[in-house]
Each structure stands twice: as C-alpha cells, then as structure tokens.
C-alpha cells in the first residue's frame, strides 16, 4: 500500500504544478521537455547498477515497447497541461481520473483481474464518487471557457485512458520486476529525445523563445513525474497487475 500512496502523492502534485506554472507564465512545453530530461537522468542514476548488457539482451522487447510508449508520453502530458490551464484544474482532473474505466475495464475483460460483484460495486461507486465531487465546480468552469476548450477534458479522458491501458498491457506482457528499471528509463528517455527534437525545431522556427526559468520548472516537475510512473509500476506488480483495483483506487484518492 505504500507504493500506492506514493503514486497518489506524486501524481496529484503534477496537476497542482501545471496550475502554478500557468499563473507564473512559464512556457509549458519547454517545462515538459526539461521534465523528461530530468526523468531520464533520474532513471539512469537510480537504476545504473542494474543496467547490464545481459539485462538488455534478456529484455530487449521491454526496451522497444517502453520506447514506443515514451513517444506517446510527450503529447499526452502536454495535453493534460494545456487542459489544466485552459479548461480548469477540476474538469481536467475529473477527466484524467475517470479515464480509469479504460484500463480497469480492460483488466476485467481479458481476465487480468478476477471478476466479482463486490469489485464491480466498488468500481461503480468510485466513478460515481469522482463525478459527484467534481460536477459542481467543473460545470461552473466550463461555462466560462471557449467552446474548443470545453473538449480538452474529453481528449484528456481518451488519451490518459489509452496511455494507462498501454502501461498496464506492457507491464503485464513484457515487463518484470527485474526489468522495471529498463521500462521506466527508456519510456522517459524516448519522451525526452522527441521533446528535445521538437523544441529545437520550434526554437529554430522562432515559434517559441527560450525560457531559462522553464529549466527550473522542468526539474521541479520531473521529480514527481518520474516517481509517479516508478511507483505505479511497483504498485501494479504488488497487486499482480490488477488494474481494476489499482487505477480506480489511485484515481479516487487523487480526487
């Protein structure tokens, strides 16, 4: 349960930081790019003793799968940040957390998690509780936003759900406790590489201008972001990949 608690704390802090960065006028994209650089460095520092050639040879499928996953992290994380800033913290958090129905439903459907009426009741109560907690504030906020911004939480719901589903699938199919370090490191490394390439292009075309404070904000963001995934994988391993329990419980507590 400690891993689950740490996952909740780290994940919740990300939404708060997005809101703070908006108020401080910090370029979100640059912060996210530096955040993934920090995540990659953390992954190497924490896991470097375990990163042997033999481990790579044994778990090359995990490396490839996590690298492909990492390429999806950047746009999804950026979308969550944009939605938090323009559609509001509450509706974005609601959409992100309600996305648990995708990985949790998949876990039950394919038999990763055992079906029980008690579990289904808890699952339904979790969804209802999240909806009721956020319904009032989100309604007020969305009325005040532009029409396009109203759809941002919907995009967050879809992308976050598919991302969590992919993490669950890869963790179940390829990753093991032994290869967990490789999974985390190469997921963030791929996101960092694509982010740096995109940032260089944008700076060259003068679509954005370099912000030194974005580096510091990226460092602050990167620490909880790395450990949110690191402890999520440990939580899934601890609960035997039971996504129907882990994701609803985690998301309900974050709300």
Regions found by a protein language model. Name each.
Residues 1-67, 77-86, 135-156, 186-238:
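Membrane-interface interhelical linkers
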Residues 2, 20, 30, 91, ...:
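Residue-level recognition of membrane-helix boundary sites in multi-pass small-molecule transporters
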Residues 12, 70, 74-78, 100-105, ...:
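Hydrophobic/small/kink-forming positions within alpha-helical transmembrane segments
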Residues 26-27, 79-95, 175-181, 232-250:
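Structural motif at transmembrane-helix junctions in multi-pass transporters
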Residues 38-42, 95-110, 121, 190, ...:
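Alpha-helical transmembrane segments of compact multi-pass small-molecule transporters, enriched
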Residues 42-53, 104-119, 158-172, 224-241:
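Hydrophobic alpha-helical transmembrane segments in multi-pass integral membrane proteins
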Residues 66-69, 114-128, 178-193:
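Alpha-helical transmembrane segments
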Residues 105-108, 118-137:
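Hydrophobic transmembrane alpha-helices of multi-pass small-molecule transport proteins
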């Amino acid at each position: 349960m400690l891993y689950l608690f740490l996952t909740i704390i780290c994940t919740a802090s990300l939404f708060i930081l997005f809101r703070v960065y908006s108020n401080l006028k910090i370029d979100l994209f640059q912060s996210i790019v530096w955040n993934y650089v920090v995540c990659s460095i953390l992954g190497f520092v924490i896991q470097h003793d375990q990163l042997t050639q033999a481990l790579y040879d044994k778990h090359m499928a995990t490396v490839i799968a996590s690298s492909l996953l990492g390429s999806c992290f950047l746009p999804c994380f950026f979308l969550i940040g944009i939605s938090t800033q323009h559609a509001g913290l509450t509706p974005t958090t609601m959409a992100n957390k309600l996305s648990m129905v995708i990985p949790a439903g998949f876990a039950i459907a394919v038999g990763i998690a055992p079906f029980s009426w008690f579990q289904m009741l808890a699952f339904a109560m979790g969804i209802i509780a999240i909806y009721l907690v956020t319904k009032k504030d989100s309604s007020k906020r969305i009325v005040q936003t532009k029409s396009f911004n109203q759809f941002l939480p919907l995009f967050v719901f879809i992308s976050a759900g598919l991302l969590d589903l992919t993490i669950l699938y890869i963790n179940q199919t390829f990753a093991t406790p032994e290869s967990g370090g490789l999974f985390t490191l190469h997921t963030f490394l791929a996101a960092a590489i694509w982010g740096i390439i995109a940032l260089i292009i944008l700076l060259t075309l003068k679509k954005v201008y370099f912000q030194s404070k974005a580096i510091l904000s990226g460092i602050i963001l990167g620490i909880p972001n790395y450990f949110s995934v690191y402890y999520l994988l440990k939580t899934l391993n601890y609960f035997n990949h039971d996504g129907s329990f882990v994701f609803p419980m985690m998301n309900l507590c974050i709300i």
